[in-house]
């Protein structure tokens, strides 16, 4: 660095530091500002002319150019700028001379110091070079000794490593036997490090050792995986899952450990398990473990002590040893770089292991209780409501399902713990976690659903319903027709044949054969045919311990609910969006699968218990009435269902609607029975007079009012009855025997009526209306709500010797109903009441048809009413009528209550009055002997009616007696009766008949005299008195018509006034 040395001329500048005044500092700054302004001017005004690349010669030539393109015109400006810059530079130098001198002095000092350092460095370099030359003097013997030493040292290291390597496999075997997996992992790691040593890698004799280490690593991995599965799925006794989950529950449900002295105590404790509390206790261990890991994330510790094996943060709860042990094993697997493989294996084996939990639990029951299970095969035929709680097999099954669901619960808790450990051991930045918990969760729910299907879905119900689905609102509808697929399958074993031929059976046999050859394989309608390989994770369906039934839910519900509640928050928050929760799964299954099975079961039980029986089979009721056995069968079934579903204490809308649908089904069954019994309602297809009367709306309204106690409509009823048969007294125009019910049909209708009355005696009393506050929001799902919604009780042990016991003697059975359900229940009750009304009305019509038939026959068969000799004999038709009435009354008395019996006979005397009066039109000639005969028959008939009636004083046939008595009197007496209104229900035509019969004998004699004269048949007989009386009746008819019109107008005005007044109010 000699070039830094300055020339030695004159004196050296001294270094001095003087402080500047404010004025000096301002002057220095001002000079610099002026110079800066000059430079800025150059940059702005001369930037295109003056630049770093400007050629001075070219610039000088441009200033000499006076043309318009030259710079001659700016030459003066350039000189002025030059002078100005020079002046300003001089000012800067003058103002900054002291600072400049100081800087120059400093520079001199620095150059001097650098030169001294260079001299010292050069001396040091020379010394080092001389020392190096002395050290590197050739020493041949020393180099040889050094080389040999290095060679022998390396050889000794290799031998030590080989000796250590040869001992590692044996140490690994010993530690594997002791299950000291952490030490095994350390030894393997050391062995692979030694094998990767360059000095050992080329040794051929050590290659088997390397292979042995790889096999031991694989063995270690398999042992770790197996122990993880043993812990998760409770295969070994190392981790007692009953202590890890909840020791209290197993004390309650376990028969061998509960210590109960009686079955009642055991059942009481089973029923009163607090699911919410136990679920919190069970989840406490997992929550504590997850909390500990979140607090100690990244602080991974390993302890080989079996009591506190903790790969991650050691939990304070010793009951977490299962989770800790799994964590330790996973950490060991992670240390051998096989954690992703382990996660895949755990995920793929999950379905099989979950299925094995169920299989092993059920097989344990089969091996322990084979005789009880044999008895269970006949259970379905003996009891359609599942195992009774008193049955020891029911208790065994409860324990079995508790064990299954608790093991499944512990398994999924372990999987959740693995998920948390995976985030610590193998964190990932992607959205997909390393451990596929959601996939395992889905497999677990699938297995639970298959378990429920195995014990709940009865194949007989599915086949018996033939695919028809009845919605909850009550109406039975067929399943909706699905649209045809756009891309139908090319081939399917069961659908390649159009008809149900024998070839189709062969197709099913082929499917069965494939299933036998390949266990677990089933030909599915949605099989993937893109590959010849079967990709199926399903298992061959296991035989259930007891016949499947919806009532098996009694032993499944509580453990299922505990599992559901305990796993309600087990799905990690990052997976909840696309994963179904346990509570949602439970609710969906119960509503979409289990509830339809309940409805199908009810329909099946109704078919088996009611519909399949002879509808006309009889049984004695508690009132000794013969009623249909189907009514008693339905009551027994209905009582059992109400008791099983606990309708007296809990209102469950969907269950209630299923029960109401069943009740409506029973009503429709009886309605169909009624229609088939009475016959078609089409008047064109049946000539029965009763059918015609049933179709008469006005008449049916009158019957309704009469049965409700209105006794003012008997005359109007009679008018409507005879509208269909106005000429009943004429041969060929009246009723025949075919219009009446035969004895068998009559007895059946009586029994039907008694059955409906018996049903209405107990059914309406079951209803108990309640007020339900509607909640605007959907209530949150929890175990307590779900338990109250789906809990079953036990079926009733009804006394078959007296199955029609009253509800009071059967535990005060009720069915709680809200407003909507009450209306549906009332509609069914109204249907039965309508059925009762029709049956009672039919009995009324039948007995009236009998009276009309016999009275009509009485007039048709009596040809002479003007006999010469009087007779007191009773007409055979009237005698037959009285005999039939007495026999019918006896049957009614035996079958129906007194009220209904009386309602059938009430008003019958009015109908007879009407028939006897209208039948007078068939009498041509009537004398006093004929009148006596008629009055004799009417009097006997009236006496018979009074004997049949509970209120004899109300039986009045005086109208008929007066009618025929007047036939034997004068016209003056007739008009006197009319004046006194003693013939209120006789029409003008009836009065004309009286007049005709009063003069009939005289007219008959006149006709006889004319027949003997020459004017035979030319002149009709006439009577002045008769003609005047007829004219007087005609005038009276006109006056009555006017009076009747006035009366109708008055009534109409009164109604309009009443309506107007009501509207004003």
From Swiss-Prot:
Chain segments annotated as coiled-coil in the UniProt record: 114-148
Region forming the signal peptide: none
Superkingdom of origin organism: Eukaryota
Keyword Disulfide bond annotated: no
Cellular component terms per the entry's GO annotation: cellular bud neck; cellular bud tip; cytoplasm; exocyst; incipient cellular bud site; mating projection tip; plasma membrane; prospore membrane
GO terms (BP aspect): endoplasmic reticulum inheritance; exocytosis; Golgi inheritance; Golgi to plasma membrane transport; protein transport; vesicle docking involved in exocytosis; vesicle tethering involved in exocytosis
Phosphoserine PTM positions: 16, 19
Xref: InterPro entries: Sec8/EXOC4, Sec8_exocyst_N, Sec8_M
Membrane topology term: Peripheral membrane protein
Basic and acidic residues bias locations: 1025-1046
Composition bias, Polar residues: 1009-1021
Region annotation (Disordered) ranges: 1006-1065
Pfam families: Sec8_C, Sec8_N
Keywords for this protein: Cell membrane, Coiled coil, Cytoplasm, Exocytosis, Membrane, Phosphoprotein, Protein transport, Transport
Subcellular location: Cytoplasm; Cell membrane
UniProt key word Coiled coil: yes
Family: Belongs to the SEC8 family.
The protein's role, per its UniProt record: Component of the exocyst complex involved in the docking of exocytic vesicles with fusion sites on the plasma membrane.
Subunit description: The exocyst complex is composed of SEC3, SEC5, SEC6, SEC8, SEC10, SEC15, EXO70 and EXO84.
Protein's name in the database: Exocyst complex component SEC8
Organism for this UniProt entry: Saccharomyces cerevisiae (strain ATCC 204508 / S288c)
Lineage: Eukaryota, Fungi, Dikarya, Ascomycota, Saccharomycotina
């Amino acid at each position: 660095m000699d070039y830094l040395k300055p020339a030695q001329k004159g004196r050296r500048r001294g270094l001095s530091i003087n402080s500047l005044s404010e004025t000096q500092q301002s002057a220095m700054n001002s000079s610099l500002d002026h110079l800066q302004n000059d430079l800025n001017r150059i940059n702005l005004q001369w930037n295109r002319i003056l630049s770093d690349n400007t050629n001075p010669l070219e610039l000088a030539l441009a200033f000499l150019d006076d043309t318009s393109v030259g710079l001659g015109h700016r030459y003066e400006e350039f000189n002025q700028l030059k002078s100005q810059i020079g002046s300003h530079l001089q000012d800067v130098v003058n103002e900054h001379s002291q600072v400049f001198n100081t800087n120059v002095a400093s520079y001199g000092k620095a150059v001097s110091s650098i030169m001294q350092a260079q001299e010292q460095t050069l001396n040091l370099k020379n010394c080092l070079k001389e020392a190096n030359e002395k050290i590197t003097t050739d020493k041949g013997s020393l180099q040889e000794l050094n080389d040999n030493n290095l060679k022998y040292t390396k050889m000794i290291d290799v031998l030590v490593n080989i000796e250590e390597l040869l001992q590692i496999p044996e140490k690994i075997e010993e530690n594997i036997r002791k299950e000291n997996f952490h030490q095994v992992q350390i030894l393997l790691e050391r062995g692979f490090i030694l094998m990767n040593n360059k000095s050992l890698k080329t040794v051929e004799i050590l290659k088997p050792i390397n292979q042995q280490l790889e096999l031991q690593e694989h063995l270690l991995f398999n042992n770790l995986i197996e122990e993880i599965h043993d812990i998760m799925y409770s295969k070994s006794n190392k981790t007692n899952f009953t202590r890890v989950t909840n020791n209290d529950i197993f004390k309650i449900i376990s028969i061998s450990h509960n210590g109960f002295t009686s079955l009642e105590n055991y059942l009481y404790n089973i029923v009163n398990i607090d699911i919410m509390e136990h679920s919190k206790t069970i989840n406490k261990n997992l929550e504590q473990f997850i909390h500990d890991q979140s607090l100690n994330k990244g602080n991974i510790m390993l302890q080989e002590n079996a009591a506190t094996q903790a790969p991650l943060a050691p939990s304070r709860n010793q009951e977490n040893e299962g989770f800790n042990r799994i964590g330790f094993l996973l950490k060991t697997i992670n240390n051998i770089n096989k954690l992703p493989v382990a996660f895949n294996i755990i995920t793929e084996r999950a379905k099989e292991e979950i299925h094995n939990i169920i299989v092993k639990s059920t097989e344990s029951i089969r091996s322990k209780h084979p005789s009880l299970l044999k008895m269970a095969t006949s259970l379905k035929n003996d009891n359609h409501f599942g195992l009774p709680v008193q049955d020891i097999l029911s208790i065994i099954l409860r324990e079995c399902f508790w064990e299954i669901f608790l093991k499944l619960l512990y398994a999924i808790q372990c999987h959740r713990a693995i998920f948390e450990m995976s985030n610590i051991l193998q964190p990932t930045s992607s959205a997909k976690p390393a451990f596929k918990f959601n996939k395992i969760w889905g497999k677990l729910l699938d297995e639970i659903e298959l378990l429920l299907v195995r014990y709940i879905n009865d194949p007989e119900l599915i086949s018996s319903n033939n695919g028809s689905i009845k919605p909850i609102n009550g109406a039975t509808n067929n399943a909706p027709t699905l649209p045809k697929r756009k891309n139908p399958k090319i081939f399917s074993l069961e659908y390649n044949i159009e008809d149900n031929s024998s070839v189709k059976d062969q197709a099913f046999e082929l499917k069965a054969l494939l299933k036998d050859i390949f266990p677990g394989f089933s030909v599915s309608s949605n099989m993937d045919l893109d590959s010849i390989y079967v990709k199926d994770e399903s298992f061959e369906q296991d035989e259930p311990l007891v016949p499947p039934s919806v009532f098996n839910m009694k032993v499944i519900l509580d453990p299922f609910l505990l599992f559901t509640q305990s796993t309600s928050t087990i799905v990690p928050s990052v997976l909840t969006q696309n994963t179904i929760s346990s509570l949602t799964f439970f609710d969906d299954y119960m509503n979409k699968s289990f509830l339809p099975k309940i409805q199908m079961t009810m329909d099946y039980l109704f078919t088996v218990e009611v519909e399949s029986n002879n509808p006309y089979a009889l049984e004695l009721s508690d009132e000794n009435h013969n009623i249909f056995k189907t009514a008693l069968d339905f009551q027994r079934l209905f009582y059992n269902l109400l008791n099983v579903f606990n309708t007296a204490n809990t209102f469950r809308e969907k269950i209630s609607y299923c029960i109401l649908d069943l009740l409506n089904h029973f009503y429709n069954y009886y309605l169909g029975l009624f229609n088939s019994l009475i016959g078609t309602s089409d008047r064109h297809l049946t000539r029965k007079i009763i059918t015609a009367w049933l179709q008469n709306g006005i008449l049916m309204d009158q019957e309704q009012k009469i049965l409700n106690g209105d006794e003012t409509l008997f005359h109007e009823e009679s008018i409507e009855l005879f509208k269909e048969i106005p000429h009943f007294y004429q041969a060929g125009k009246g009723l025949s025997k075919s219009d009446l019910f035969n004895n068998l049909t009559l007895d059946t209708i009586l029994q039907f009526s008694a059955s409906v009355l018996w049903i209405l005696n107990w059914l309406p009393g079951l209803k108990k209306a309640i007020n339900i506050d509607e909640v605007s929001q959907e209530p949150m799902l929890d175990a307590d709500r779900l338990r109250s919604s789906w809990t079953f009780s036990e079926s009733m042990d009804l006394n078959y010797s007296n199955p029609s016991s009253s509800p009071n003697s059967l535990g005060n059975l009720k069915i709680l109903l809200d407003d909507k359900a009450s209306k549906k229940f009332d509609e069914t009750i109204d249907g039965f009441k309508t059925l009762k009304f029709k049956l009672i009305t039919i009995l009324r019509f039948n007995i009236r048809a009998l009276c009309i038939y016999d009275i009509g026959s009485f007039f048709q068969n009596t040809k002479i009413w003007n006999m010469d000799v009087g007779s007191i004999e009773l007409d055979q038709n009237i005698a037959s009528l009285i005999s039939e009435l007495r026999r019918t009354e006896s049957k009614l008395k035996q079958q129906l209550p007194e009220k209904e019996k009386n309602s059938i006979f009430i008003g019958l005397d009015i109908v007879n009055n009407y028939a006897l009066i209208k039948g007078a039109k068939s009498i041509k000639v009537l004398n006093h002997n004929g009148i006596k005969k008629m009055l004799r028959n009417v009097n006997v008939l009236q006496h018979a009616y009074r004997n049949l009636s509970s209120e004899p004083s109300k039986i009045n046939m005086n109208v008929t007696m007066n009618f025929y008595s007047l036939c034997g009197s004068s016209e003056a007496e007739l008009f006197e009766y009319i004046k006194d209104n003693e013939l209120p229900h006789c029409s003008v035509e009836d009065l004309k008949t009286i007049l005709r019969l009063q003069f009939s004998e005289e007219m008959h004699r006149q006709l006889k005299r004319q027949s003997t004269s020459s004017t035979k048949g030319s002149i009709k007989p006439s009577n002045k008195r008769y003609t005047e009386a007829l004219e007087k009746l005609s005038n009276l008819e006109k006056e009555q018509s006017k009076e009747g019109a006035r009366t109708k107008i008055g009534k109409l005005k009164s109604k309009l006034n009443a309506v107007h007044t009501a509207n004003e109010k």
